[in-house]
A protein has these predicted regions:
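N-terminal signal-anchor module of multipass membrane proteins
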Residues: 1-46, 288
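Helix-coil boundary and interhelical linker segments in multi-pass alpha-helical membrane proteins
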Residues: 20-29, 82-92, 140-151, 200-212, ...
Length: 299
């Protein structure tokens, strides 16, 4: 099998998230998506460890390094799948979670020192939100390790960085627009508020004020529909490996909507959940199929 590029880690997160999204409605599909995600996650890890010299060189590029946070994020979500399949082996699932969480922290620290400190800062791209806000996936999955303080800390960090990064990225992109090969990163715009909403629901549950849910839902959905309007422009450029950035943000948006609907219970939202689930699964399957075709041509 051809070496999977580093940006494919976005598809790993997409598979992991999709497996959780349809868990209660399509359990067989959920198992298939999660198992595929876990298998590819392990393969991806071993492949890049055995080719570490080449991988290390690729990680000197800021957009690639910041986007690599999708790998530990996928690991934290997949650890919940491991626990569902092997409930009698909680240490295995928890070990995967801690490995992924610590790797995410290491990526944040390493990237900040190299590319985000004053005097060294490169221009920001949407993948910065994956790196700095994506750590909030720890709040989404914290029940596996049972340390709610981690959930509070990562959720707070995610909120602060979201409101700091959006204006920064907008300002930098006005001066340095995304190159065509990275246009897929525009899909990331809907990820931060969606992840924060899902994590809020996980931590706060029914105790969350309704207005908080509605405000977060409006922000999440606004960015989701903005991303949908950008899809024609992204797709007409032809397939790029960065298309992986179209998968996990849309899946996260559908997941957050579904979790919020579990509390709001508004009839209209049921139809929206169904529509967004179908849309994000189509995007995931399309990108995976395009990747398969792309890899076949490169052999």
């Amino acid at each position: 099998m051809k070496k999977l590029p580093l940006v494919f880690s976005g598809c790993l997160l997409g598979l992991a998230g999709a497996g959780n999204l349809v868990l209660d409605t399509l359990p067989v599909l959920s198992h298939l998506l999660s198992l595929t995600g876990l298998s590819l996650w392990i393969y991806f890890l071993l492949l890049h460890l055995f080719n570490w010299k080449e991988t290390k060189q690729e990680l000197t590029k800021p957009p690639l390094l910041s986007g690599m946070a999708t790998f530990p994020m996928a690991g934290m979500i997949l650890s919940t799948y491991v626990f569902r399949v092997f409930p009698h082996l909680p240490l295995v699932a928890q070990g995967l979670w801690w490995f992924s969480f610590l790797l995410d922290l290491a990526l944040i620290a390493g990237f900040t020192i190299k590319f985000a400190c004053p005097g060294r800062r490169v221009h920001a791209t949407p993948s910065w939100t994956v790196l700095y806000v994506g750590i909030a996936v720890a709040a989404l999955t914290y029940p596996l390790v049972g340390i709610i303080e981690i959930a509070y800390a990562t959720l707070s960090f995610g909120f602060l960085l979201t409101f700091y990064l959006y204006p920064l990225i907008y300002s930098d992109l006005k001066k340095h627009p995304l190159p065509l090969a990275m246009l897929g990163q525009e899909g990331i715009y809907c990820a931060p508020f969606s992840l924060l909403l899902a994590s809020l629901v996980r931590v706060g549950g029914a105790s969350l004020p309704t207005w908080v849910l509605i405000v977060m839902l409006l922000a999440s959905q606004s960015f989701f529909f903005f991303v949908l309007t950008r899809l024609p422009n992204i797709l007409k450029q032809g397939f790029q490996p960065a298309f992986s950035a179209l998968t996990f943000p849309t899946i996260t948006t559908a997941t957050s909507l579904k979790m919020a609907q579990g509390i709001l219970k508004h009839p209209f939202l049921d139809y929206l959940v169904l529509a967004e689930t179908v849309i994000c699964l189509i995007i995931l399957l399309f990108v995976l199929g395009a990747y398969l075709n792309w890899l076949r041509k490169k052999v």
